[in-house]
Regions:
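Short, solvent-exposed amphipathic alpha-helices that sit
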Residues: 1
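Active-site glycine/GP-rich loop and adjacent strand/helix microenvironment
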Residues: 4-180
Length: 180
């Protein structure tokens, strides 16, 4: 997905960076000089690794796409964002919520509240009864209906914990002992 958007942007400076801190610093400096917005997208564990180098990304948009993928201990999204904000010297972290089984994603602009497209619906199920749903404001497991999945299953049950509100939904973490 990121590769597609990089191609569409026609920005020659777009690139993938793994652990090349020097390249990240060069790209950051160049974006600032050109008055371009830098968008850094990465999985949680990789962003945490980068944040430990203390690069000032206060002018960048940082978007985590979730998941420690077994590389680090799972922590809450709130704790993750606090560490990333401190490490990158920024006030907020944007987020993407989705998985390879879905065609659509939900996005948060940095306050932890995710919003979906009109064809995607998130429902919060009871943690102890997978056939029951909880009221708005209560915590439970996240179920997703994605009508964009026209050639595959349009609904999935995740092992993520969440809470729905009037303005969207929050992802609070994973069920204990759930698979990565």
């Amino acid at each position: 997905m990121v590769s597609h958007f990089m191609d569409q942007s026609e920005c020659r400076e777009s690139t993938f960076i793994s652990k090349d801190i020097n390249l990240l610093e060069q790209k950051t400096e160049k974006a600032l000089k050109l008055k371009k917005t830098l968008l850094l997208i990465g999985v949680s564990h990789a962003l945490l690794d980068l944040s430990e180098f203390g690069i000032d990304l206060s002018e960048a948009i940082i978007m985590e796409t979730g998941g420690m993928k077994g590389k680090r201990l799972e922590i809450t999204r709130g704790d993750l964002h606090k560490l990333l904000c401190e490490g990158f010297n920024t006030s907020r972290i944007h987020s993407e919520y989705g998985m390879s089984e879905l065609m659509s994603q939900a996005y948060s602009l940095g306050e932890g509240m995710f919003r979906t497209s009109n064809w995607m619906k998130v429902m919060i199920r009871d943690s102890y009864d997978p056939f029951s749903y909880v009221k708005s404001g209560k915590t439970g497991g996240i179920n997703v209906i994605d009508l964009a999945n026209i050639h595959s299953c349009s609904f999935i049950e995740t092992k993520d914990l969440g809470r729905e509100t009037d303005s969207g939904f929050e992802v609070l973490g994973r069920f204990d002992n759930s698979d990565v």
